[in-house]
């Protein structure tokens, strides 16, 4: 039984389909790291991870220690990589929970080494290389080769992987992404010349998987990191139009009408006088607000699906509630409203919502609050 009259519906068949789409694109002998950061982009990290592991994922990727610990409590043996920065103070928890960490400096590696030795354990690390994102990482040059040699000499560390991140592989013209891969491959080859090898070599996110697996840029890669495509979205609308791979929507945001009331002409609905009733108006109240992840700016800007009919979201979205106009809509209290997700029910999908707000589907779904229950179908 639901604890609230609003929830996130997650289509598990679509999760499986999208993972299969990844497997159909990457090389047959490749490993796959399912990226489940930000609560699996809103889908629920535990259940999504369980499904991806059942479908053949070799690794799970997250952004923070807390995300990794949540997964570790459910998956005791599964490899988990924290792709984001791990503060030195977290070193002991990384070691104690058998988590893999991203590193990008000798100083960080030395701290992790000391903590691993103190615990009489080994900490797995993946070295980040900056090939053009200019966010985190060692630069692919001779100095970094010397740094990697010093890191490899540290006791207590298992240098499991090396990786980079593509910043613009969803662009129509792939010059920058290909230049990044050219730099990464050249660096890997220089390391090989020095007899430095890694169990895992990875670079391709969803955009890379969808657009760069047909060339030879990935010839040295053996691990792939799908993220947004697992949840049914293409990294950009342009890529959706040009990509033959079919992805299926996973996430729908739903709520029930908890009260219907008639408001006379000449009244304001909600905070701030943002919707004026120029006629007698039938208003449905939903127990869903911006604290749940329904962005406040969507008030007076979208239509929602109710019984295969479209009704406007009116007034400003409140922290915990919002309003729909039900004039000429067949609806009753308790009926389900789809804020976004299921296109077959006439609802907007998350990418359309994002376009209205000059953002992306990633933000629309990953900001869905944990206080919303996830209902898996």
Swiss-Prot record:
Task: Enumerate the active-site residues.
Answer: 37 (proton acceptor), 271 (proton acceptor)
Keyword Transferase among UniProt keywords: no
Q: Which cofactor does it need?
A: pyridoxal 5'-phosphate
Q: Which InterPro entries match?
A: Ala_racemase (IPR000821), Ala_racemase/Decarboxylase_C (IPR009006), Ala_racemase_C (IPR011079), Ala_racemase_N (IPR001608), Ala_racemase_pyridoxalP-BS (IPR020622), PLP-binding_barrel (IPR029066)
Q: Name one GO molecular function term.
A: alanine racemase activity
The role this protein plays is: Catalyzes the interconversion of L-alanine and D-alanine. May also act on other amino acids.
- The name under which this protein is listed is Alanine racemase
Q: Which gene encodes it?
A: alr
